Swiss-Prot record:
Major location category of this protein: cytoplasm
KW RNA-binding (keyword) present: yes
Subcellular location: Cytoplasm
Gene3D superfamilies per the UniProt record, alphabetical: 2.40.280.10
HAMAP family: SmpB (MF_00023)
InterPro entries assigned: SmpB (IPR023620), SsrA-bd_prot (IPR000037), SsrA-bd_prot_CS (IPR020081)
Record protein name field: SsrA-binding protein
Purpose: Required for rescue of stalled ribosomes mediated by trans-translation. Binds to transfer-messenger RNA (tmRNA), required for stable association of tmRNA with ribosomes. tmRNA and SmpB together mimic tRNA shape, replacing the anticodon stem-loop with SmpB. tmRNA is encoded by the ssrA gene; the 2 termini fold to resemble tRNA(Ala) and it encodes a 'tag peptide', a short internal open reading frame. During trans-translation Ala-aminoacylated tmRNA acts like a tRNA, entering the A-site of stalled ribosomes, displacing the stalled mRNA.
Annotated GO CC locations: cytosol
Amino acid sequence: MARAGNSLISHGRVAENRRARHDYSIEETIEAGLILVGTEVKSLRTGRANIADSYAGPKSGELYLYNAYIPDWTQAVKAFAHEPRQPRKLLVHRREARRLISAINKDGMTLVPLYLYFNDRGFAKVQLGLAKGRKAHDKRQAIKEREWNRDKARVLRDKG
C-alpha cells in the first residue's frame, strides 16, 4: 500500500502529448491497450511518463509504441528493471491493426499518441491519433482560426 505522501494514479491521465495537435492534423482517434511489465505499471501509477517524441508503427503485422519514456521505478530490484524507451506492443483488434498499417503505408499518415491513461478498470491505455503532418503555413492558419474562435466566444460571452 502507498504511504500518505505518495499520490498514486488509479485512473485518469498519466501523460499528454501537447505538441501532437499542433504538429499534426488528427483525422481519427483510436484507443489501444499496452503490454507492460510490472515496474512500468508502477512507474506510470506515480505519474511519470513522457510521450512527446513517441509514435506508433508496424512491426511484423502488429503495432508497437516507439520512443515512449517510462522511467525506472525507484523501488524496483535491478533484476526486474525495464528499459525506459523500449518498444511496447499495442493491443488492438487484428482487423483494426491491418487498417491502420495500410493507412500508414499507403496514405503517408502517422499514428501519434495523444494521451496515456488508466481507464476506469485500472488498465493502461493509450489514445492514438491517425494524423497527417502539418506544414508551417497550415500551423499558422490553425493558430489564426483558434484565435478567431476565442475572440468570437469572448465577444458573445461579454454581450450575453
